[in-house]
Every structure is written in structure tokens, then in C-alpha cells.
């Protein structure tokens, strides 16, 4: 994902525009009902066009880039504990390494323990 002037200007694996900074989408989105419907409609369009092998990012990209400024935003999660879960081994990695970090940070936030 590429950001320029605090707006998402690209949302794909290859870059085609200038940007101030870039980052990776972790694939978690909070959408309004209207935006969810637009993504569904765009997905249906891709399917009707026979574009069944496109990455999901392309559909989201189309909706982001055709929406008015300010509709979509991003969060910088640099340094926050997270893991992409694709396989069973990733679940175990999350359980053993990520979850304890999240719980520790939560305890620190609430003043329940000393930092480790």
C-alpha cells in the first residue's frame, strides 16, 4: 500500500505511482455497509468478466482508487505484535510468541505488571 499526502494512492504488490511512504496491508479491514457492498459488486464484476485468478487486492484497489478522498484510511502498526496466519504452524507461532506479547502489552497498558 502506498500513501501520499496521507491518502492511499496504491494498493497492490507492484508500484505504479509516486508516494511518501509505503507499507504492507495486514488484510484486516473495517468497512461500512456501503463499502462492503461496493467490494461485493466489484468482486461480482471480476467474476462476470472471467477474472477469477486476480488477487483480492485488485478488487479492493479498484474500490479505494474510485472512492472520494477520505473514505479509506490506514493505521501504522509498526512495532505491534501480529502474524499473518496461512498455515497451522502460523497458529502455533501466534499462540507461542504473538499472544504472550499482546497480553504483556495489555497488562502494561492497564498498569497490571512491570514491563518485561
Please identify what each model-predicted range represents:
Residues 1-46:
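Conserved core of the sugar-phosphate nucleotidyltransferase
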Residues 34, 38, 44-116:
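Left-handed beta-helix
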Amino acid at each position: 500500500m502506498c500513501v501520499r499526502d496521507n491518502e492511499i494512492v496504491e494498493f497492490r504488490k507492484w508500484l505504479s505511482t509516486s508516494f511518501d511512504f509505503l507499507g504492507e496491508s495486514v488484510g484486516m479491514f473495517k468497512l461500512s455497509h456501503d463499502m462492503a457492498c461496493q467490494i461485493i459488486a466489484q468482486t461480482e464484476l471480476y467474476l462476470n468478466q472471467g477474472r477469477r485468478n486476480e488477487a483480492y487486492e485488485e478488487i479492493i484497489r479498484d474500490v479505494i482508487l474510485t472512492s472520494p478522498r477520505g473514505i479509506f484510511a490506514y493505521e501504522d502498526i509498526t512495532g505491534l505484535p501480529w502474524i499473518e496466519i496461512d498455515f497451522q504452524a502460523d497458529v502455533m507461532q501466534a499462540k507461542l510468541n504473538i499472544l504472550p506479547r499482546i497480553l504483556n502489552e495489555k497488562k502494561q497498558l492497564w498498569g497490571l505488571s512491570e514491563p518485561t
